[in-house]
Structures are given as structure tokens and as C-alpha cells.
């Protein structure tokens, strides 16, 4: 089943308006969810939308609250998200980081006390659209064991790196620090598929490719094993220092995944060189990667983010594939 982009956008906008968003903010927020689905990231588009509505119903998200700057020094600012709508606060924070980068060459906004930003790649892509290198990350609730542990004390804190291309075909890594995000586990389970590689442990303590089994135990494995575990811990520390807000451990006391810490960094390469030279560097590296001999005959080797361009084009032309039960939930709201 496929749904036209404009239809999906209109339904998201209708629901958000119903739950207290102004028409302008409802449209801006709905675009984020619809664009995520258009890009093929259903886990943080349609599939995540009902959960956000549940948070609105419970009063965990204030649809009228807007983040504000509470401290600044040169190219750095600290913002309080006031537990408002996470994606809009994050978008506005990256907008400001880009403004600072255009002024100083680099800009950083440390956004504390925000709610879930949905897909972190939204903000890396946003920076790249503005001609900037984008670096951003968020912490989470404790949802992953540290390396060597059984219980969850660290987050699968998503990390995003994006580089801009003048033609809009940016290169971007958008990854949770678990082998698979919980959103991806849900997407694979709904599709009735196994994971391509092991992603965590089942109830017997065995490594498994069964997404439902990992969702049940909540014992995911970090990317790179101990390396991903260490990276998660340090990102949490750096983010908490810069925001003066909530660590993974503190978020774990809130009951729901709210009050998160997020860092937005933008770097303007035009301060050093022309966009043509930046494009040439990216194109040369991408071409070299693509020239690799594939491990499996006929398999494409490519840079991260390149599949997204194809998904956007295909889904705009043919409609966005949806899980029927998720779409029915939205229509019933």
C-alpha cells in the first residue's frame, strides 16, 4: 500500500492541529514526519507518529512551547528546550547553528531538556542543504547495556555526520550506536523480516537476528561492540556538559523518554574554499569508494545516504509505502 506524500502530510497536519499546534507549527512539524517517510526512514516517520501523539495526549509534550537561548559565547549557544516538541526545537537549533557557522565558520547549539527529535538525519541534511557540514547527536533513555553488562545503563545515542554537495545529493551517516535502532527493529518486525546480522540477545542470552526477541529483552549490542559502548558514554558526557541538562541516567528516572540532550554543530567549508572544490573532493572520494570490487557479484558499493536520494524520487512518484495498521491508526486519530 502506498500513500501520496501530500495526503500523508495533510493527515499529520490535521492530527497535530487537533492536539494544540498552531497551523504554522503543525505544518512545519508534519513536514518533518512526512519527509522522513519520503526518505524511506519509516521508523521515524509514519511508524513513530502514533507514539508522539500518545505523548501529546499524556501531556509529556507541550505543543506551544519553544526553545530559547539561555547562554551564549561567540559561536556557541546553550538552549533550553522546555520539553517542547522535539523535532521543531531541534530544527530551529540547527538553523541557529548554521547562522553562527556562516558568521564564524563554525556554530554550535547545545539543546537541553528537549524531547525526542525523531530522525537525527533530518538535521544533518538541513545543515548540508545550507552548504554546511553537519554534526549532531542526541542522548536517549538507558536502552542498551554497556559492553560487558546485562542491564541497560547507556543510550544508543544517535550520531549524524553530513557533508554538503551543491546538487543536493549530500553524503550522510545517520546511525544509532546500537547495531539497529529500536525503530528499525519495529520496521523489520512489522515487515515479517529477520535482521541481516545479529542485533542483540534473546531471552536465552543467545545472539539473535529476530527483531521481536530483541525488543522483548531490550538487550541490543552496540556498534563495534566495546567501541560503540565507549562512544555512547562519551557523547552522553559531552552533551550533558555542554547543555548543563540531563544525562542518560537522569533521563532514566523520568518514566518516559523526555528531557533529552542534543548537540547541533554546523561548519561552513566556504570559509576555506569554494563549493566547487568541496564538490570535487566529495565526488572523488565517492567515486573511489564506488570503484570497489563488490563482495557479492552485482552488489552496489556506495557512500552512506546515496540510497536516500533514490527513495525520495521513487516515493514521490509512486507514493510512500506504509504499514497498513500504522496508517489506519493515523486516520482514526
Put a short name on every predicted segment.
Residues 190-251:
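Secondary-shell segments that build the walls of catalytic and ion/ligand-binding clefts
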Residues 154, 158-161, 176, 230-246, ...:
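N-terminal nucleophile
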Residues 2-3, 9-29, 34-35, 42-60, ...:
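Acidic, glycine/proline-rich low-complexity segments that act as flexible tails and inter-domain linkers
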Residues 45-100:
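Active-site cofactor/substrate anionic-group-binding motifs, chiefly glycine-
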Residues 77-166:
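A generic, well-ordered mixed alpha/beta core segment in the N-terminal half of proteins
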Residues 2-3, 8, 18, 242, ...:
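Catalytic-core signal marking the mid-to-C-terminal active-site face
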Residues 144-212:
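Phosphate/diphosphate-binding glycine-rich loops and adjacent basic-rich segments that engage nucleotide
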Amino acid at each position: 500500500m502506498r500513500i501520496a506524500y501530500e495526503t500523508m502530510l495533510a493527515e499529520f497536519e490535521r492530527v497535530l492541529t487537533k492536539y494544540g499546534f498552531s497551523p504554522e507549527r503543525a505544518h512545519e512539524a508534519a513536514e518533518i514526519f512526512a519527509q522522513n517517510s519520503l526518505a524511506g526512514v519509516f521508523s521515524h516517520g509514519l511508524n513513530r507518529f502514533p507514539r508522539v501523539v500518545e505523548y501529546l495526549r499524556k501531556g509529556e509534550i507541550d505543543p506551544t512551547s519553544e526553545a530559547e537561548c539561555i547562554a551564549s559565547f561567540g559561536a556557541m549557544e546553550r538552549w533550553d528546550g522546555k520539553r517542547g516538541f522535539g523535532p521543531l526545537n531541534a530544527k530551529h537549533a540547527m538553523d541557529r547553528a548554521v547562522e553562527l557557522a556562516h558568521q564564524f565558520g563554525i556554530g554550535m547549539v547545545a539543546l537541553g531538556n528537549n524531547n525526542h527529535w525523531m530522525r537525527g538525519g533530518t538535521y544533518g541534511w538541513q545543515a548540508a542543504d545550507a552548504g554546511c557540514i553537519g554534526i549532531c547527536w542526541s542522548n536517549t533513555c538507558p536502552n542498551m547495556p554497556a559492553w560487558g553488562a546485562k542491564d541497560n545503563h547507556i543510550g544508543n545515542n544517535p550520531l549524524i555526520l553530513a557533508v554538503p554537495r551543491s546538487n543536493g545529493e549530500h553524503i550522510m551517516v545517520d546511525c544509532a550506536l546500537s547495531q539497529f535502532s529500536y525503530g528499525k527493529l519495529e520496521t523489520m518486525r512489522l515487515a515479517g523480516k529477520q535482521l541481516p546480522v545479529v542485533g542483540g540477545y534473546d531471552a536465552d542470552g543467545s545472539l539473535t537476528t529476530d527483531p521481536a526477541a530483541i525488543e522483548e529483552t531490550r538487550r541490543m549490542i552496540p556498534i563495534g561492540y566495546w567501541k560503540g559502548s565507549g562512544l555512547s558514554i562519551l557523547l552522553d558526557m559531552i552533551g550533558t556538559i555542554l547543555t548543563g541538562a540531563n544525562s542518560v541516567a537522569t533521563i532514566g528516572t523520568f518514566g518516559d523518554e523526555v528531557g533529552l540532550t542534543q548537540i547541533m554543530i554546523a561548519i561552513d567549508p566556504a570559509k576555506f574554499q569554494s563549493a566547487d572544490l568541496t564538490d570535487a573532493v566529495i565526488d572523488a572520494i565517492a567515486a573511489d569508494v564506488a570503484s570497489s570490487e563488490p563482495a557479492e557479484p552485482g552488489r552496489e558499493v556506495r557512500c552512506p545516504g546515496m540510497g536516500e536520494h533514490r527513495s525520495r524520487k521513487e516515493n514521490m512518484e509512486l507514493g510512500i509505502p506504509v504499514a497498513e495498521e500504522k496508517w489506519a491508526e493515523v486516520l482514526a486519530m
